Regions:
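Conserved alpha/beta-hydrolase
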Residues: 44-73
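Short beta-strand/loop motif that positions the catalytic acidic residue
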Residues: 212-214
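Conserved loop-alpha-helix segment in the C-terminal half of the alpha/beta-hydrolase fold
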Residues: 216-253, 259
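Conserved acidic catalytic loop of the alpha/beta-hydrolase fold
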Residues: 84-102
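Flexible "cap/lid" loop of the alpha/beta hydrolase fold
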Residues: 112-123, 127-155
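Short beta-strand element of the alpha/beta-hydrolase
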Residues: 20-35
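Active-site nucleophile elbow and catalytic-triad environment of alpha/beta-hydrolase enzymes
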Residues: 134, 184-202, 234-238
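Catalytic active-site module of serine/aspartate enzymes centered on a nucleophile-bearing elbow/loop
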Residues: 245-288
Length: 288
């Protein structure tokens, strides 16, 4: 495995798999115990997502995989997780993998990172944002949620989930704080830095292929513990679909899927393969 030196002096492991054009994916590849996997399934998540993505996409691309979220939970950057530093971190990962140009796929806040990366570099040959709209992004509501999480973590470092309680898939309001003060503060830092970010004024290179997708039911409702906010993702993507297409985006709103189900490998793998294949054919056609 290669390693990249990040902005805070920590190093992150990188897996490179396959041949072809480089495709950077911030994916969690660590194996799950059966109990961990079952808990994730109970919540509606896909415990095999990372390995499945890498295995499927490395058949056609040189996949550069690094667990950036896991790294930041193990090595928080509470004061320095800014958009500029996040972009620099992903460029460092690409450099360590000797990827002069690369595609990028990220989901949820890692999709946000991809947008911040795209406005700071000309090295991308494709950008895919899943589970976070490029226009009317939920920056204010996510700041409220992360501030609430940080306040709860700061009050107690010993909060843990109740054991063997049934969970309702997608019941985000029932989630318990399992992160510490530094881990949560880094996301406050990130979203505070994005409060003045005007996604309606973002001008990406016209020739950069880009895809945004989300489930039509991707809306997360938080109660008083989390700031009484609703994080809307599918709704703004659908509302701005025509505007985004006119700006050069491809848009897919996935019927009836929520935030977790829209990121499952059985949804994402065929979607990415089809779209990336189209991008490749279009680029070959322009070169002929």
């Amino acid at each position: 495995m290669a390693e990249a030196l990040l902005h805070d002096g920590t190093t992150i492991s990188i897996l490179v798999s396959g041949d072809g054009r480089a495709l950077l994916i911030p994916a969690d590849l660590k194996p799950r115990s059966e109990s961990e996997a079952q808990t994730m399934r109970d919540w509606g998540a896909d415990p095999d997502l990372g390995p499945t993505l890498v295995s499927a996409l490395s058949q056609s691309y040189r996949v550069v995989a690094a667990d950036y979220e896991g790294h930041r939970m193990a090595h928080p950057a509470p004061d320095t997780l800014t958009p500029e530093n996040v972009a620099a971190d992903f460029l460092a990962i690409a450099d360590a993998a000797h990827a002069d140009t690369f595609g990028y796929y990220g989901y949820s806040w890692l999709a946000l990172c991809g947008l911040q990366l795209a406005i700071r570099t000309n090295r991308l040959w494709a950008l895919i944002m899943g589970g976070f709209p490029p226009l009317e992004g939920p920056y204010k509501s996510m700041l409220a949620v992360t501030r609430a999480a940080h306040s709860a973590a700061a009050r107690s470092s010993e909060q843990s989930p109740a054991v063997n309680l049934p969970v309702e898939p997608g019941d985000w309001d029932a989630a318990t704080i399992q992160t510490n003060e530094a881990q949560t503060r880094q996301f406050v830092t990130l979203y505070e830095a994005l409060q003045d970010f005007g996604d309606s004024t973002v001008a990406l290179a016209r020739d950069l292929p880009r895809l945004a997708f989300a489930g039509s039911a991707d809306q997360i409702v938080y109660g008083p513990r989390w700031g009484n906010v609703t994080v809307r993702i599918g709704e703004p993507l659908a509302a701005h679909e025509r505007e985004l297409i006119e700006a050069g985006w491809d848009v897919q709103v996935l019927p009836a899927l929520d935030h977790l189900s829209a990121m499952h490998s059985d949804v994402v793998v065929p979607l990415l393969k089809a779209w990336l294949g189209k991008v490749g054919r279009d680029q070959v056609g322009r070169e002929q």
